[in-house]
Amino acid sequence: MDLLSGTYIFAVLLACVVFHSGAQEKNYTIREEMPENVLIGDLLKDLNLSLIPNKSLTTAMQFKLVYKTGDVPLIRIEEDTGEIFTTGARIDREKLCAGIPRDEHCFYEVEVAILPDEIFRLVKIRFLIEDINDNAPLFPATVINISIPENSAINSKYTLPAAVDPDVGINGVQNYELIKSQNMFGLDVIETPEGDKMPQLIVQKELDREKKDTYVMKVKVEDGGFPQRSSTAILQVSVTDTNDNHPVFKETEIEVSIPENAPVGTSVTQLHATDADIGENAKIHFSFSNLVSNIARRLFHLNATTGLITIKEPLDREETPNHKLLVLASDGGLMPARAMVLVNVTDVNDNVPSIDIRYIVNPVNDTVVLSENIPLNTKIALITVTDKDADHNGRVTCFTDHEIPFRLRPVFSNQFLLETAAYLDYESTKEYAIKLLAADAGKPPLNQSAMLFIKVKDENDNAPVFTQSFVTVSIPENNSPGIQLTKVSATDADSGPNAEINYLLGPDAPPEFSLDRRTGMLTVVKKLDREKEDKYLFTILAKDNGVPPLTSNVTVFVSIIDQNDNSPVFTHNEYNFYVPENLPRHGTVGLITVTDPDYGDNSAVTLSILDENDDFTIDSQTGVIRPNISFDREKQESYTFYVKAEDGGRVSRSSSAKVTINVVDVNDNKPVFIVPPSNYSYELVLPSTNPGTVVFQVIAVDNDTGMNAEVRYSIVGGNTRDLFAIDQETGNITLMEKCDVTDLGLHRVLVKANDLGQPDSLFSVVIVNLFVNESVTNATLINELVRKSIEAPVTPNTEIADVSSPTNDYVKILVAAVAGTITVVVVIFITAVVRCRQAPHLKAAQKNKQNSEWATPNPENRQMIMMKKRKKKKKHSPKNLLLNFVTIEETKADDVDSDGNRVTLDLPIDLEEQTMGKYDWVTTPTTFKPDSPDLARHYKSASPQPAFQIQPETPLNSKHHIIQELPLDNTFVACDSISKCSSSSSDPYSVSDCGYPVTTFEVPVSVHTRPPMKEVVRSCTPMKESTTMEIWIHPQPQRKSEGKVAGKSQRRVTFHLPEGSQESSSDGGLGDHDAGSLTSTSHGLPLGYPQEEYFDRATPSNRTEGDGNSDPESTFIPGLKKAAEITVQPTVEEASDNCTQECLIYGHSDACWMPASLDHSSSLQAQASALCHSPPLSQASTQHHSPPVTQTIALCHSPPVTQTIALCHSPPPIQVSALRHSPPLVQATALHHSPPSAQASALCYSPPLAQAAAISHSSPLPQVIALHRSQAQSSVSLQQGWVQGADGLCSVDQGVQGSATSQFYTMSERLHASDDSIKVIPLTTFTPRQQARPSRGDSPIMEEHPL
């Protein structure tokens, strides 16, 4: 398939290339003597013309044989198919190629033109004529005589004349044979260098002239063709006397050149031969061999005696350029000498070029006829120029003598195509006589000329042209038929029938006109009426007689001139106008419309009123009628007059019309009541009147007419009980119901009478007083009631005037007074109840006001906080409060050594220990609502208070306190975290409920500036009264670590617990030790903290249990002997990487700040178990430092929120494994937020709240849970806890003996699943006899040993 496709593409490309070149050659092979109508080839297939893309051809493809006029071609070609056939002419190779050497091929050439011009190509076809054996070889003579000396040696050879065969190749002479030689002679054949075969006679026996002097035999020559042809000749051998020597040529081969114009007698060459004999035997005779052609014998002369060769006739190189002359030199013997003379005739420019015209377009009487509309490049003839001369003498060019719309385009050597170079135009040039010139390149050049005649045939390519492009004619109307209007004319540039023009009316021409077909005269055949048609616009056509005919048109405009032949015409014969009677004077009554079909002045109409009527005027131009009077319908209802209309024609025409003006009534009168005559009249209605009885009739009249006078009645007021009804047309008032006692009295009925006028109806009203009673006993009272009713406004709810119930007003007043009294009493009662309920709150507010000097909230939040306090219901705690006080010192940041200003805050305290004992530590949590945005919640731990009993005998010097650094812009209230004032409210300033005495403690505290970031833990020293732990935190957390910035002040808060307090602050759990103990460490710490510094932090924010926002994880345990003062400086990154917006505003707390992890060697089960009991944030943090299996197990047991957080920070393998056990919501959320390499920097931190109660079931701890560490006293035993020894973490069930330093860890427990608060139980050092016992679940309760 690929091969076929490639072949097809190659053929297409070849066809395109060939056709683009414009000329092509094709070779065929034919044999001579072929019969007629033998198929030679198919040009359509052989030239791949069927592969040419299908083009839109003007005519079908045509093949035309181009040959010279008078020639008889040997072949013919089918014009439609391109098939080539032989003709009846004989194909004779020997005749066609007589002058060429025998060793050259014989060709016959013709040209074929492929039409039409869109695909024109000229193809030269060369036919190679193959020789057939149609000629027999012949000897020069039928009898060959030869003489042989009798002393010829045996095997001597004597050359015989050669036979000649016109055929070539195998069909030529191939063999000779000697017949009847009597064994005396034999025959041998030799081949000359030119390829000729020469017979030689061989002497086979000794000759004896005396015995026999003559031998006669036959010699036969044969060719090699099929069938084989041969001929014979008689060979007569004469035996002569002995001849000892033979002639010898001095030169056996001679080649000479002689110009073809050499004159006759010119010596060609001189031959020299010698013979050693003497006498007669020495005489040499020169002669041409019988192999020399007849042409050579005719052109050259050989002197038999001297051997001189001369020109006998003029030479012609173009006829025979080379001649071979075989010369024999004989001394009379039988062995002549041979010499070959080769004569080359050189060319001279003796031949003029010849011009051969072969027509592609068949001529008529030697003239080519071309249509003027033939396309460009139309091929006309093939011009072949030849020159018989050689080289540059035969190089010919051809051209025309002057500028003509034709050109010669070369296609083959010395062949040119004559084609059109421009469009022909019969109208400009009708005939062309083209002179063709041909010149060779010889010196001097020779030229030749020929004439070619072309006649242009006219085509109908020109349409008639009118002399006018637009014809305008005017004619008056009312004309006589047959009037000639105008004559139109047109010309045509064509000739003959193409120029004959006929005139026709266009299809849009009206029937009123006619046109002469030959002359173009336009005539009106009907009477024209301008009022029907004022103009005519139509076309006239001019059509020639060509094929196809061509037409053109001209527009004719006929304008009709008007005549005053029409009178003005009113739109109506009679006009009736209706005007209201209130039409003002000179108002518009109406419009008279008049038309006149004429034009111009003939249609200018003027209007006027006849009979000199002065009551009305009419505008003469517009026809508007206006009154000069005021109308009164009652005086005159209509007016009549005539209007005249007259045109402005030369002979004017007029007409008139009747006008009637009718005055129309206007609704300008209201109905007037006749009955009742006034509003003061009344009608008596007896209570016994039956329903449906007409009790009264109102009558109203209207002075208008028609609908304006039609009156309708209706009740529009009074009649509140619907006791009466009125007929809208008659005005009869009918009683609708039976009257009872309540209906007695004067009824005031408002009756409306309105007309039906349009567009606005007019109306009047009247009061109809109907007195329902048995009789009129007191006319004065009735008249008074009527008078009062007239003075009172009338509404649809007008009540009746009851003469029998004068006390009704007093009853209404009494009812209103009672209702008002009851309302006042209810309002007073409600007010008292409300104030009673608000009394406790008012007292609490008063106390808050009294304590405002030491508890002042942030100014921006004061108003909002106070509003919250009023709205929330406070929960009251037991009446006990620890003794606390806070001292806040502020200094300028730029003066480090300044003493600063001391500010003392007074806090309420209660020193009674019995009160403390009443507080329920277990049931009263110190948690806050998670969404509370206040400072107290921010700095307060979210865990409930631990349940333990504080011993009152704890000495003051054993109490621990911690300094907490707070943001400068926050006011921290030092109210007890487990007190009533803050345990149940999110308001951090709700201290007014702490209704206890106030004791003031004042402790001086030095102002600290922020130490450098690389400062390590201070040395810890024992304190007698109190121990201070100071932690500095920059007020504004930043993302980048930086040192102390000058100009920013710091603040610290010191919390103290006095002697005898029931609550103490917690420290880091340090016992008695020296400063050197701080340097010991067991493993690396995160964030660059020193080991001791990290573990000595009481809370992430260094807050104490003794303030109002204490951290439960730092709960004090009785028995601690000493505390330490440390300063921890977390970097800015430590305090801000996991900060929330609340932390950035209020400062850092355990809600947002998380210390780094401690250990990386945790048990998988312990990690998973711890995560299952940790809050979401801790679980997510743990995920970051746990091995994959632990992460997956932990995630499967975590609540959805924890799973989502952890998944978002876990690597992809963990996410995939955990998601298999996660709910759909967690899967979708985690996958959406988890990056490919999920890591979170926040996982490096974990607050103390994240410790899990499940830690009791495994020895190792999760590596990311932040654990507190404390130093153990000697001889300490614990029921439950863990210690870090040499072998790692282990349970302290066995107890820790001796003075070895041990590290203990806290535990935490979630109260319930929905609560974010974590109860943290710190395990710290114990004095002897102290132990930890289990409490709720796994949370131990620390208590003093019984001893």
From Swiss-Prot:
One of its GO terms (molecular function) is calcium ion binding. Disulfide bonds: none annotated. Glycans are attached at N27, N48, N54, N344, N553, N773. Residues 24-812 are extracellular. Residues 1-23 form the signal peptide. The keyword Transmembrane helix applies. It comes from the Eukaryota. It is a single-pass type I membrane protein. The chain crosses the membrane at residues 813-833. Residues 1057-1091, 1097-1116, 1326-1347 are annotated as: Disordered. GO terms for biological process: cell adhesion; homophilic cell adhesion via plasma membrane adhesion molecules. Its main location: membrane. GO terms for cellular component: plasma membrane. It is found in: Cell membrane. Keywords: Calcium, Cell adhesion, Cell membrane, Glycoprotein, Membrane, Repeat, Signal, Transmembrane, Transmembrane helix. Potential calcium-dependent cell-adhesion protein. This is Protocadherin-11 X-linked. It comes from Gorilla gorilla gorilla. The gene is PCDH11X.
